[in-house]
């Protein structure tokens, strides 16, 4: 699978569709799964990556309350989606409502998944959390 990289800004159309960067489209040619992500965004996984992540989540013990809660959110908020012929992805209204995506969306490549943010929420996130990246405290090899 091609790496999903970069930050792209798009307007949602009146139906709630967002265009994907042309270099992302091949990764989602076999379909995608949208689900609620952490930090106020949506995660969008290519179908093959979703299958791998699903196996990991399904392996969480049913006896663990946090594991059950995580699985409920991960699967319960998920929606299988397809790209249309113009490379657009329809974001279901209920998911747009969950993360506050209205008119402008940020499409962020995060290596093996895509994140979709409301533009204003993404700007707030970067202002609040950009310091951790600048400090390099989680950079590989620094722990």
What are these regions (language model features)?
Residues 1-10, 14-15, 24-81, 85-86, ...:
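Flexible "stalk/tail and boundary" regions
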